[in-house]
Amino acid sequence: MGVSFTFYPEDATYIHFDVIRSFDRPLLSSGLLEKIGNQNVKTELDWQLYLLQRRYLDYQVNIGNRIIELLTSGKPENQAKAAEISLPKTHFQNLVDDLFSETGKKILRQSNEIQFEQDGDILTPYQLSSGEKQMLVILLTVLVQDNQPCTLFMDEPEISPHA
């Protein structure tokens, strides 16, 4: 059997890809933990979330720069285009809020990093359940692709993403 790919364009020379690992087991490299300086990062999922937080910050800067460029262009039609640029981020936030609604968690939209509010408390992604972390890793990985073509390789060791 095997795997086959159909490329578009046909003369493409590379595939942009990302890997999602959803194992929630403890990190073994204590040297790595010391380097990042975040005591909340304890598992492989936490590590993925940590890396995705950095990519999310870059994503926000990039879309912010594109919005500024459009708004300062002097072209009236670019105002509508500028508003459209932030739609994927808003869709992501709405989707996460909907998926986590049973637990009362909502994304703090005014925060630069991913944080949640639940019953007046502020939560980091590291405080989420394993299934919530897995879902957040998947959705964040898709968001930070910034509408660019990408192949995602993903394992699924647990049933929790189905719930």
Task: Tell where the protein language model's regions lie, with residue ranges.
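Switch/communication elements of ASCE P-loop NTPase nucleotide-binding domains
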Residues: 91-163
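Phosphate-coordinating catalytic segments in nucleotide- and nucleic-acid-processing enzymes
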Residues: 1-123
